[in-house]
Regions:
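Catalytic cores of transferase enzymes with a strong primary signal for eukaryotic protein kinases
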Residues: 69, 408-412, 427
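Charged, gly/pro-enriched flexible loop segments at helix/strand junctions
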Residues: 398-413
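Short conserved micro-motifs at the rims of enzyme active sites and ligand-binding pockets
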Residues: 219, 318-319, 362-364, 382-383, ...
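Long, low-complexity segments enriched in small/aliphatic residues
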Residues: 254-257, 414-427
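Phosphate/diphosphate-binding loops
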Residues: 331, 373-396
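Catalytic alpha/large subunits of respiratory electron-transfer oxidoreductases
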Residues: 1-346, 350-358, 394, 398
């Protein structure tokens, strides 16, 4: 997990560095935030994370966008944070500016609060997990009304003919009409039709919330939203096309000079086995079993020890009952925790780590223009230690202390991170 905005006392980095010093580990692939998108988008657009970092800026939206379609909303509560910390908050400011510049918003979410009230956007409340059906109804309307940009599709896409056969029901006998979509998503057919026409007649930005990936078949809403954006022919136009997760964290849509932040070196993991991030239960319940991922078949390794730091699987994993069953399988579960939470209560060994208030660090990220000194405000409580100190002690007992610390103290490492970032910025 993140655990802290600090660049050095980042629990995952510390854990991975330690494990690589003692022979490696089975890693998790992708993130709980948007793993389905990380898997599907490279097959359609390219690297998902690169697309996030180069999202259409709010400045371009303010100058060019006329209609902003918010699938999953633009929840400002999420935009208060970002990986590595936030110095420049701008999501609320830009939303209000956009509303004052006559950009029309529609919040397509079961939650009205997923779009700022001051924006005065329209609210459409679909049944949860039906966004793809809604988008298929929009696609059908665009085609039936001659609103599809055929020239764009022919020049920049492949496979539209196959997709159209599905939309028209030629492959399964079910035309994806607005009436069909309405019965599933519980937004009436006329509203869906009007939404599609408004999208076609305006410079439209489609924003897809990361939350849409964290549902059954979570890759489908992203794939379908990209398809609708392609049908509109506005991908690549200023203020048009598609964006992923405006205000999912603060940085999406930002435009500023970014320091090229340096991270703590983690070393090389000699172990090739991995699991998709949300399949911990499957890993523990089915050792040596097979699983399909991104078009290939892999095997779950046999797992005897689980080590968790900086996060809590009982907070963000799905199907907690099944996770509880799986949690009984390993021989030993170790965690670094600062409080007696659900993870600590279910671990065999709990090593008390301190909080960001009890250590020195530096907040530094390639997604924010600020570098922030994080001062230690209080002494470490009781026997708690930093993650670095915890792993240093274990590494000492295992004979790899020098390899783990790099013969540096935590202060040395923080200074090194700052100095190396300075060098990259100058270069």
């Amino acid at each position: 997990g993140w655990s802290s905005a600090g660049r050095f006392h980042h629990a995952q980095s510390q854990l991975h560095r330690f494990l690589n010093c003692i022979g490696g580990y089975t890693k998790s692939k992708f993130t709980y935030s948007f793993a389905a998108a990380e898997t599907i988008v490279p097959h359609i657009l390219g690297s998902f994370r690169e697309f996030l970092d180069t999202s259409t800026s709010w400045e371009s939206i303010l100058e060019n966008t006329k209609f902003f379609v918010c699938l999953g909303g633009i929840p400002l509560k999420n935009g208060q944070i970002s990986q590595g910390g936030v110095g420049k908050h701008f999501q609320r400011e830009k939303l209000i500016e956009a509303s004052k510049s006559n950009i029309s918003f529609v919040n397509i979410s079961p939650l009205k609060g997923d779009l700022l009230d001051e924006v005065k956007g329209e609210w459409l409340s679909p049944r949860p997990n039906t966004d793809t059906a809604l988008l298929l109804g929009i696609a059908h309307t665009l085609h039936q009304n001659g609103l599809t940009d055929i020239a764009f599709l022919e020049k920049y896409t492949q496979g539209y003919e196959k997709f159209l056969e599905y939309v028209l029901g030629e492959t399964d006998g079910i035309p994806k009409t607005t009436n069909w979509a309405a019965a599933i998503c519980e937004i009436d057919a006329v509203t869906i039709e009007n939404l599609a026409k408004k999208m076609a007649r305006n410079r439209t930005m489609i924003s897809v919330s990361w939350s849409l990936t964290r549902q059954d078949h979570g890759e489908q809403p992203f794939w379908m939203a990209i398809t609708v954006a392609a049908m509109l022919g506005q991908i690549g136009l200023p203020g048009g096309g598609i964006g992923f997760g405006y205000s999912a964290t603060n940085f999406v849509g930002g435009q500023f000079t970014i320091p090229p932040a340096v991270a703590l070196p983690q070393g090389r993991n000699p172990v090739s086995s991995f699991i998709p991030v949300a399949r911990i239960s499957d890993l523990l319940l089915h050792p040596n079993g097979t699983f399909d991922f991104d078009g290939k078949e892999y095997n779950y390794p046999e797992t005897k020890i689980v080590y968790w730091a900086g996060g809590n699987p009982f907070h963000h994993h799905q199907d907690l009952g099944r996770l509880m069953q799986a949690w009984q399988k390993p021989d030993t579960i170790i965690c670094n925790e600062w409080c007696w939470n659900s993870l600590a209560k279910r671990s065999d060994i709990v090593l008390p780590c301190n909080t960001p208030l009890e250590r020195e660090d530096i907040a530094l990220t390639p997604r924010d223009p600020y570098v922030v000194k994080m001062s230690c405000l209080i002494e470490s409580y009781g026997e708690s230690k930093t993650d670095f100190e915890i792993f240093q002690g274990i590494a000492r007992a295992m004979g790899v202390e020098s390899k783990f610390t790099g013969e540096k103290t935590s202060t040395d490492w923080i200074e090194w991170l700052y100095e190396e970032t300075q060098k990259k910025a100058v270069a």
